[in-house]
């Protein structure tokens, strides 16, 4: 199945072609700088791959010439052949400072190392330093902050501490206003712009923990995408006759057409391999997959 794998690899490289051609405003570098990166090195990496090419084959045949004579001539046909190509490409390698690490070996950014994990939604922002979510404190964000015991008046009457937050309460003859902090008589008054904003701020503080975690995950995905795009870009640049940004539309169309032909050839190779795998001789002495001594 080696031929099938080689064909699929070549087709996958051409599929990245249009994505890697920079558009307007794409110049200026795409590698995102980050904290903890002490240096970036450009390494020369050997690249080995198989590429296809058209080999001319001359087929003799007889034809009718002038004077009703039979002449011998030939026609030129082409067949797809494979050859091994060895090239060198440049790749960027990031070196992290002490106390920082890469998420994976090919990452171009570094993240801080905390010997003990940051709890309750905290994020490790520097070596052994956590940035805690609202309502939590301590070196590892393991301490619940009792907002009710601070010097700031958060509730007009009663304050109840909760894990990572607090709630306000009122005496039995009063009701809690829409801001969640002020007590008032009877039914609460229609919400004002200030009270609505206050509630929105509290909701935003609660969502901050989830948002930070999502940003952290998205940064990891971006690093992996940058790595894959860099590898694919190096592969495509190695097999193209000119850099992708110098390709003309007609050249892109031609390469895309070659990709379609390669896909068709790969399907034919797979069909032949399946048929050959089902073949066997009458005495099984030379059948594929059968070894008799």
UniProtKB/Swiss-Prot annotation:
One of its GO terms (cellular component) is extracellular region. Residues 34-112 form the EMI domain. Disulfide bonds join 38-97, 65-71, 96-110, 114-124, 118-130, 132-141, 148-159, 155-168, 170-183. It comes from the Eukaryota. Keywords: Calcium, Coiled coil, Disulfide bond, EGF-like domain, Glycoprotein, Repeat, Secreted, Signal. GO terms for molecular function: calcium ion binding; signaling receptor binding. Glycans are attached at residue 50. InterPro entries: Dev_Signal_Modulators, EGF-like_Ca-bd_dom, EGF-like_dom, EGF-type_Asp/Asn_hydroxyl_site, EGF_Ca-bd_CS, EMI_domain, NOTCH1_EGF-like. Residues 111-142, 144-184 form the EGF-like domain. Its main location: secreted. It is found in: Secreted. SMART domains: EGF, EGF_CA. Residues 1-25 form the signal peptide. Residues 195-232 form a coiled coil. This is Epidermal growth factor-like protein 8. The lineage of its organism: Eukaryota, Metazoa, Chordata, Craniata, Vertebrata.
